[in-house]
Amino acid sequence: MANRERDRELLIPVADFGDKDDGSSSKPSSSSSASSSHQSGHETLSLFIRGWASKKFMTGCVILLPIAVTFYTTWWFIHFVDGFFSPIYALLGINIFGFGFLTSIAFIFLVGVFMSSWLGASVLNLGEWFIKRMPFVRHIYNASKQISTAISPDQNTQAFKEVAIIRHPRVGEYAFGFITSTVVLQNYPTEEELCCVYVPTNHLYIGDILLVNSNDVIRPNLSVREGIEIVVSGGMSMPQILSTLDKPLASIGNES
């Protein structure tokens, strides 16, 4: 009897249990793969939506930032200029916004007319004589005067005469600068005409002064104000095509 029961135990099909286990385990694996693919699809969609939203948000910032800065600067400037004469109108009982600003603009215009005369120039020279005797104030005045003279519409007193392009610092590289004056270098028995070119290195009031032969100076078709805008904007307002004012200098720019 014992041998028969042992033989029956050996004949028990063990593979059926394995098949049942495989079937039961395959169902969770297939469901887990489906859920993982569904989850990856959600992640891809969310990443796409977030990327699209961030891109459109940055586009809106790029468009609105210069507009906001322009309006804010203009509004601040109007309030700043209006503040010079608005207290006077307030004492007179006139509280209309803009009167101080219009009065300041008219005052600046009258100052320009007066300083263009002989009497105004004499008064200005006398005031500069007193300012230049002050230890610390004269340095501030000289620096601010040089910047204002650079954009002056008067060609006789303008610090920046012309916009210039020179080879600097190596052959094949060009630097953007301004011609401030000309000088004659006497190297006996010959003389060489040099242009004093101011090349800004940091903003507009810090730079290098280079003496360059007048034949090596390329003069583009840019005004001084356009050149200042190019320097202040870091070259972003540079036109795509530059042409020279005279043909002989154009050939210099085309050399290797």
UniProtKB/Swiss-Prot annotation:
Membrane side Extracellular: residue ranges: 82-93
Record has Membrane as a keyword: yes
Stored Pfam families: DUF502 (PF04367)
Cytoplasmic side: 1-60, 115-256
Tissue: Expressed at low levels in flowers, stems, roots and leaves.
Residue ranges of the region described as Disordered: 1-39
InterPro entries: COV1-like (IPR007462)
Membrane topology label: Multi-pass membrane protein
Predominant location category: membrane
Keywords noted in UniProt: Membrane, Transmembrane, Transmembrane helix
Presence of keyword Nucleus: no
UniProt subcellular location: Membrane
Spans through the membrane: 61-81, 94-114
GO CC annotation, single: membrane
Compositional bias annotation for Low complexity: 25-39
Biased composition (Basic and acidic residues): 1-10
Family the UniProt entry places it in: Belongs to the plant COV1 protein family.
Protein name: Protein LIKE COV 1
Organism this protein belongs to: Arabidopsis thaliana
Gene assigned in the entry: LCV1
